Amino acid sequence: MSSTKTPISLTIKLNQFTDKPTGLDINRYHNSPIMWRNIIKQLSSRTPQKLLFSSKNRTYSFLGFGQDSVFKDNTKFRSLIPISCSNIVMGFQNLGEYLPGDEFLSRPLLKNQVNSNDFCCRKSYASVAEAVAVSSTDAEEDVSVVDEVQELLTELKKEEKKQFAFRRRKQRMLTSGMGHRKYQTLKRRQVKVETEAWEQAAKEYKELLFDMCEQKLAPNLPYVKSLFLGWFEPLRDKIAEEQELCSQGKSKAAYAKYLYQLPADMMAVITMHKLMGLLMTGGDHGTARVVQAALVIGDAIEQEVRIHNFLEKTKKQKAEKDKQKEDGEHVTQEQEKLRKKVTNLMKKQKLRAVGQIVRRQDDSKPWGQDAKAKVGSRLIELLLQTAYIQPPANQLAVDPPDIRPAFLHSVRTVAKETKSASRRYGIIQCDELVFKGLERTARHMVIPYMPMLVPPVKWTGYDKGGHLYLPSYVMRTHGARQQREAVKRASRNQLQPVFEALDTLGSTKWRINKRVLSVIDRIWAGGGRLADLVDRDDAPLPEEPDTEDEALRTKWRWKVKSVKKENRERHSQRCDIELKLAVARKMKDEEGFFYPHNVDFRGRAYPMHPHLNHLGSDICRGVLVFAEGRPLGESGLRWLKIHLANLFAGGVEKLSLEGRIAFTENHMDDIFDSADKPLEGRRWWLNAEDPFQCLAVCINLSEAVRSSSPETSISHIPVHQDGSCNGLQHYAALGRDELGAAAVNLVAGEKPADVYSGIAARVLDIMKRDAQRDPAEFPDAVRARALVNQVDRKLVKQTVMTSVYGVTYIGARDQIKRRLKERGAIADDSELFGAACYAAKVTLTALGEMFEAARSIMTWLGECAKIIASENEPVRWTTPLGLPVVQPYRKIGRHLIKTSLQILTLQQETEKVMVKRQRTAFPPNFIHSLDGSHMMMTAVACRRAGLNFAGVHDSYWTHACDVDKLNRILREKFVELYETPILEKLLESFQTSYPTLLFPPLPERGDFDLRDVLESPYFFN
């Protein structure tokens, strides 16, 4: 018997459902003789760098199933955190792929990669003792090894308990505190919403048709739904005929291979709803461009085909698995019992990464723009052939019925600036009777990207995150190929800060404020016209004058044109409100819902749902509140009063914080009256600048003040902290500009500085000086005299706000001209134009004086962009959070494709960049990438501090009780952001990317101390 000590490598197949391992596989290995002691030492170590298995890793992740395992094809244990096998000292290498824990047991085994030279499954033993007895000839070594193995098993058991607790904590985080069963129920509903919306609509139409045809019932349907129902059957049948030709190979059309991939009824519903949606929301209401409509419909069909194919594939895979299960009766009873448990787990958890699974398992290629356009065009053509409309029956019985097409296809010619040039494009125009019904269409429309019932899937890649099934992309690239490729190339680690921020924004739970919604519904049912709601009736057209006077008739025609334009705008607003209310009504009975977020190319975050979200108008913000309520506390009660004053506005928001509190307390009777009798009482809330948000706060504040303990009253209201002309705040911080910093509240003051009033005061000083000059020598003196009494903050506000976007002289002139025209102070058009030119010049001069550092930085950024773009390169940079940005401005080329409806002109990027656009757009885009970074940094810090957070670019929201914490965090993050050498890094990146180009030196910076921001109460307020 040899006494030489031989190291033993051990594979333990842990049974997750029992306390004991099912067996031990032992093979001799040639590594360290003190291997077991090293393992125990590493397992028990508390130093993170030395842990072999941290508390976040499954202790048996490295333990693969044997080759004869009954689970080999069905199951694989996975690590909660990907780890490198090379760090494992047990003699095993590369035993398998490590997957995230939230996908644990969620899909079949991906092939284990086992190095047969390093690991051999030769024989199994009933116990540790038997294994050691067979493998060792030294008695002392036997005892030593058994003791060490038992110690190892004890440590593994402890570690598994830790993992169980960790998984429970993670599950609670995943389900947002709603409980596992409730979460799964809501998740299944969410999957149905995303995957069955079109199918359910088609089913509803088929059931209505059955009621009409088979049971001789005429359903009492809303006007628009009756139109849909009338169009549905003939369109479905026409599509089915076309599909039959395609499937039999009788159609040689380019769209043939795509047209039969979806049931005809679903295609019919998608075509009707998408076209009507475009007619509602397009710029010219009642018409839609053919190319846009074709692409939108084609894209919707492709998305639904992918979901449909995946669901069909899933059904087949399930059937195959069920058959395999029936054939596996030879396995032991214990193994069968264990397999059933694993199968049940898989069933319960198979939806965990459903969005990613769809994209991972769907190996079909994207259709491309040409295919989408051809499919969409053919479906539009079929709708044109089958959709008709008949006016109400008010004709004489002897007259033939007036049945006419619901949609018309025509060509519109648009003249360009030069009379010799013009362009033509095809449009789809709906009949007047259809147009009148568009406003009532919203509540019957299928809206696929609804708010989610469960938290969005966490972002892990360009197209991995957001919705469960619906295609979701982390960035809105709008076809910009280089931008899309830049994001895809970026590593997950580089983008992790952005992903984490988007996950934070998406995890905020919202609900509908039913009391405010009921008030909106009452106003809307009464015809609108209150609280900034548009009039539901059109303005009457002026009567035609009974005269041959051409001057009077010309004036009448202009008035008719003006009223028609106003009515189109009213129609557009009514459609928009109907869509918002349709979503609010659908979600009003939900306990809560979530908005998945993504970013634009600059890194600004937006909710993916387009209609009812907190970035929207006052009506949206008024009906949205946090689903979680928190006690106000003393601080929260104070901030709720300040928030009410801010919403009332009208100059109140410019008072000190104490002044705003006093304003609210002085109007408590009005607040109570508004809460109790919003429409029957004095209607004080209607005087607010944001009336519906004001009403929501009136209701909440009334409940709190009237309660026995206002501080313990629960509040769901998001309280806003808004930046003061935030773009100029970022410029002042970049340039360390003391004068600019004081103007935009980067330093403390007794009350908030108003940059617009400051600029207006400077403009007035210049104009008063100019008014004293001799008009013969200075012609603008006359204009200065005419404008002296017109200068106020409203006149210059838009120009000051857009100055950070690089507003040009022409842009400023047009803005000021609109303000002057609204006031009617200057009647003559030529005099109005001259006055606007002069006022714009003076306003830009005042801006340059007050924000000299901002102007110099803006100029430097523009010069750098011009140098780069002159080399036919787009301007690129990386945001402080690691997001790669590529400006998308390239010259657009035309690509003609022939469809069954018409020849379509598709736009596509060329290789030639637009030098001027690259230069003028870079300064505002760069600043927006910085304000987006600040918001994301604040969002993540708030989540870690336990705050609910929502953001609207330069407006940060949280519960009233947490506003003080939010204020501290957002100031700290602003200072943290600008303490990094942002401009220096930008210049360095330019010089590295373009070593042969010469860039101008950085502009000089001032002496402003960034730490002053921490003590400024009105920086955000």
From Swiss-Prot:
Main location: plastid
Catalytic residues as annotated in Swiss-Prot or TrEMBL: D722, K797, D954
Subcellular location: Plastid, Chloroplast; Mitochondrion
Domain of life: Eukaryota
Keywords associated with the record: Chloroplast, DNA-directed RNA polymerase, Mitochondrion, Nucleotidyltransferase, Plastid, Transcription, Transferase, Transit peptide
Family the UniProt entry places it in: Belongs to the phage and mitochondrial RNA polymerase family.
Protein name per UniProt: DNA-directed RNA polymerase 2B, chloroplastic/mitochondrial
